[in-house]
Amino acid sequence: MESIAAATFTPSRLAARPATPAAAAAPVRARAAVAAGGRRRTSRRGGVRCSAGKPEASAVINGSAAARAAEEDRRRFFEAAERGSGKGNLVPMWECIVSDHLTPVLAYRCLVPEDNMETPSFLFESVEQGPEGTTNVGRYSMVGAHPVMEVVAKEHKVTIMDHEKGKVTEQVVDDPMQIPRSMMEGWHPQQIDQLPDSFTGGWVGFFSYDTVRYVEKKKLPFSGAPQDDRNLPDVHLGLYDDVLVFDNVEKKVYVIHWVNLDRHATTEDAFQDGKSRLNLLLSKVHNSNVPKLSPGFVKLHTRQFGTPLNKSTMTSDEYKNAVMQAKEHIMAGDIFQIVLSQRFERRTYANPFEVYRALRIVNPSPYMAYVQARGCVLVASSPEILTRVRKGKIINRPLAGTVRRGKTEKEDEMQEQQLLSDEKQCAEHIMLVDLGRNDVGKVSKPGSVKVEKLMNIERYSHVMHISSTVSGELDDHLQSWDALRAALPVGTVSGAPKVKAMELIDELEVTRRGPYSGGLGGISFDGDMLIALALRTIVFSTAPSHNTMYSYKDTERRREWVAHLQAGAGIVADSSPDDEQRECENKAAALARAIDLAESAFVDKE
């Protein structure tokens, strides 16, 4: 197997994180965390300054006031550093600016140029379900680029890149997830009220479906996995200490830099370096030469399904045969249910970020994500969380049972009743709720697991699903990483019993799933975790070991990308092979609609 380090992480590529200038362009008032203890994160605004202009302007409005504010920030920073002395403490510095001139998409382009498809970076957005099937933009959007550190695992080989030190190390370990976990055990981030109640910094990346092999080493070894034809990492995590958080309700942006005191000889050095880095981050979003985004033109009926995709890792007959084999195992009592997937391929001249911009229109979902990782770019519109841990509370939300949306409200209501009266889909959903209760129960305090919501209907742009919510209180001696290990992968993408179903998936599917049906999201410095299930996720491979760019439309601008769209269907005793094949095709075609729109909006007009 080709070395991951050699193929993707050569030392020359360590310069992903830009150097901090020796002196900042102008002094900017930086807020340092001062409140230790429990995180309340209320909306208290005392001390949070919002500036409409460039940061330089605010520094000269009132010289004496600015000087007093700067001195107060310095004092608070030193107090926070003193409390964290000897503990590897993390102290946030931030500035709050109004966002009426900036959007999350444009902010991402301010941090990552259009021609840079390799720098690890992310953009998280959300569309939440409102009453009567309405949708609302989620309150917070998050943007980050140039992680200070990366942890990348391929099977049991781990590459750790420290961009601050320019150092690459490699290890062979039993469980790569122990590496970021052990790093976090030495961190004690200062908790404050003024920062938003969202992800503000920490680990961001993805965990592939094959991550389960670190947990089930005997029954699901890597040696027994299907063919690995893309050579993608099994885990990629970037440590982001620079993050932009958009408050879409109050129309402001928190520009945040976390200072790691352990990286500095003195507190004064830490303060000055943090202020300089915050100024650098501010200068990017206040840049007078803000990148221009192509406006695009929406010419498609975005709620329609696209045309079927013809190229797949399995022919139609091969997939139907796999369904029949799975049914034989069900009839024999080996399993109750199994999810069999196949990977479709679509070539396009639209680049991944354009596809993401289109996906936001075609399929808005609670967990929208654009993630540039080592070896691939993920464009996701996930409706479902894999696991969430917030202040010790674990949430698992099985989403299973699907029907298309109607054209009118009356048709929607009819479809909803039809879905809830479908015995097959309801039985499948209850089975997955039981799996969710089992996953949460593994890491929860005795007696704390409960089903908060059972068989609710959630409406999305193209379909509606049956949804339930399972919760539990995380056991005192465990961490969010344990909750992730217990859940990954969830039953909605594997089957029941889970491990036996995955053993059969290894036999019946022809290629490794990679990011599909794994998870992507973030783990905050304080240990809170939100990992979305990697469904409705388009994977663009970028690793040099797997060339996905075959030809050029315009040698100056356009190259052809290969988009991988994977979809699966839940197989039970009375499943029809034809119906399950059609379900896979429909799911992939709905996702491919974003590529249709991206081509129509951004490519065809050139």
UniProtKB/Swiss-Prot annotation:
GO terms for biological process: L-tryptophan biosynthetic process. The keyword Plastid applies. InterPro entries: ADC_synthase, Anth_synth_I-like, Anth_synth_I_N, Anth_synth_I_PabB, Chorismate_C. GO terms for molecular function: anthranilate synthase activity. One of its GO terms (cellular component) is chloroplast. Disulfide bonds: none annotated. The keyword Nuclease does not apply. It is found in: Plastid, Chloroplast. Feedback inhibition by tryptophan. Pathway: Amino-acid biosynthesis; L-tryptophan biosynthesis; L-tryptophan from chorismate: step 1/5. Keywords: Amino-acid biosynthesis, Aromatic amino acid biosynthesis, Chloroplast, Lyase, Plastid, Transit peptide, Tryptophan biosynthesis. It catalyses: chorismate + L-glutamine = anthranilate + pyruvate + L-glutamate + H(+). Induction: By chitin oligosaccharide elicitor and the phytopathogenic fungus Bipolaris oryzae. It is an enzyme of class 4 (lyase). Residues 1-49 form a transit peptide. It comes from the Eukaryota. Its EC number is 4.1.3.27. Part of a heterotetrameric complex that catalyzes the two-step biosynthesis of anthranilate, an intermediate in the biosynthesis of L-tryptophan. In the first step, the glutamine-binding beta subunit of anthranilate synthase (AS) provides the glutamine amidotransferase activity which generates ammonia as a substrate that, along with chorismate, is used in the second step, catalyzed by the large alpha subunit of AS to produce anthranilate. Heterotetramer consisting of two non-identical subunits: a beta subunit and a large alpha subunit. PANTHER family: AMINOBENZOATE/ANTHRANILATE SYNTHASE, ANTHRANILATE SYNTHASE ALPHA SUBUNIT 2, CHLOROPLASTIC. Belongs to the anthranilate synthase component I family. This is Anthranilate synthase alpha subunit 2, chloroplastic. The lineage of its organism: Eukaryota, Viridiplantae, Streptophyta, Embryophyta, Tracheophyta. The gene is ASA2.
